[in-house]
Amino acid sequence: MNDLKSKSNIKLMKRVLTTYELRKYLKKYFCLTLDNYLVLAYLDVFKNDEGKYFMRDIISYIGIDQSRIVKSVKDLSKKGYLNKCRDPHDSRNVIIVVSVKQHNYIKNLLSEININET
């Protein structure tokens, strides 16, 4: 194997290990999956005054399988991080609703995760 390929493989394995460690860390200390974390991070980054987000936008932006995001949103809803409902104008669309209190909790949680992670 050439030197460049070996270095590339090492970098890839480091990323895989980092992802694995992050998954374990989130689960152990925060009872979150990596998918949960990605959804919460999306809600924090794209915070808006209405606190409303379309599920399809979250799925599109995060770029992982739709079923994983749907499962994550359902889990986060049960845990009280967000609420979900059908769009009254088009029942095919799911709207994620996040109150100011929920946004503050998400922001604090993400800050805690980032502090502890370093």
From Swiss-Prot:
Belongs to the SarA family. This is HTH-type transcriptional regulator SarT. Residues 55-78 bind DNA. Coiled coil: none annotated. Keywords: Activator, Cytoplasm, DNA-binding, Repressor, Transcription, Transcription regulation, Virulence. Induction: Repressed by SarA and agr, particularly in the post-exponential phase. One of its GO terms (cellular component) is cytoplasm. GO terms for molecular function: DNA binding; DNA-binding transcription factor activity. It is found in: Cytoplasm. Transcriptional regulator acting as an intermediary between major regulators sarA and agr and virulence genes. Represses alpha-hemolysin (hla) gene expression. Down-regulates agr RNAIII expression by repressing sarU, a positive activator of agr expression. Up-regulates sarS, which induces the expression of the cell wall-associated protein A (spa). One of its GO terms (biological process) is regulation of DNA-templated transcription. SUPFAM superfamilies: Winged helix' DNA-binding domain (SSF46785).
